[in-house]
Curated annotation (Swiss-Prot):
It comes from Albidiferax ferrireducens (strain ATCC BAA-621 / DSM 15236 / T118). This is Protein-glutamate methylesterase/protein-glutamine glutaminase 1. Phosphorylated by CheA. Phosphorylation of the N-terminal regulatory domain activates the methylesterase activity. GO terms for cellular component: cytoplasm. Its main location: cytoplasm. The gene is cheB1.
Amino acid sequence: MARWICFEDIELKKIRVVVVDDSALVRSLLAEIINRQKDMECVGTANDPLIAREMIRELNPDVLTLDIEMPRMDGIDFLGRLMRLRPMPVVMVSTLTERGAEITMKALELGAIDFVAKPRIGVASGLTELSDQIVEKVRIAATAHVRRAPAVPAAATPAVGGAVGGHAPVASIGRVSTEKLICIGASTGGTEAIKEILTRLPADSPGIVITQHMPPGFTTSFAARLNSLCQIAVQEAVNGERILPGHAYIAPGGKQFRVSRSGANYVALVEDGELVNRHKPSVEVLFKSVASVVGRNAYGVMLTGMGNDGAKAMREMKDAGSYNFVQDEASCIVFGMPREAILHGAADEVLPLTAIAPALIAKLSSATDRYRV
């Protein structure tokens, strides 16, 4: 006799979240936002990291939301210890200030999966407006691949012609090209993936254009951090600016970034624009413009991230003659955008993150690609 199963009666395993923040208001709001979701629950709140440490031991949560500035031990110190001793998915809750942005970049380096920018004023209304973003980032964090941080983080210091961040010395490509263009798309986990690639590219690399999903106010610090580590120059893209070899241009948060052409030069177009695939900046927007303008002189790179932003346009790039690299699942924090790019037939090579920069250099240095026009 057939037995009918009512799926509504099946209790799904909920994402267990611990909220750590020194503000009672923020703790209460975040707990309320989380508990409204059918697939997650706030199992505990703590007003400082030392209490959180005991709570993590007792409750074994799936995800931690962590404030940056707290008493007794700040969030960055706690995060560093946590990722060395008991790595777990962490979503940072950071203040939208220049200092907050710089510290957030450090948190992502230490292993935080993502961050939410809470407003300096109107916290209650601001967090309520961000509720969809908060729960989405918690869900993504719960599925992310978390890696144990090294006992002593390697200091990455730029040295022309020498090693950067512990890597082998950066090889020269041998010819500065104004025709070629490298374009990179990333989302969750992308800040560190982008750093891994850019710190391994030489000063004579072609121009590089990058879209990393990031809100306004944070890309300036991201670009400045990369610029201090790389042999190439790294900056936020500026509307109308010529795209130069040996330079990387990052889409400003909250703007759409395209590549255009003016005579023999590639030019950055930065504008407000509409959300595309729910994102601004959107990888789809950048890659579609590269397919149209750069064609077979483009090299595409799709890195870790949730969703499908950029997958269709990366296939358009391939159809226009580009050569595309996609990060493999094992090295991704979230294997969403790379998976979609592969499913769309956009990948020429699927590689571990650490292999992408050497493969790019080899491709750019090869005789067949050096004179590809």
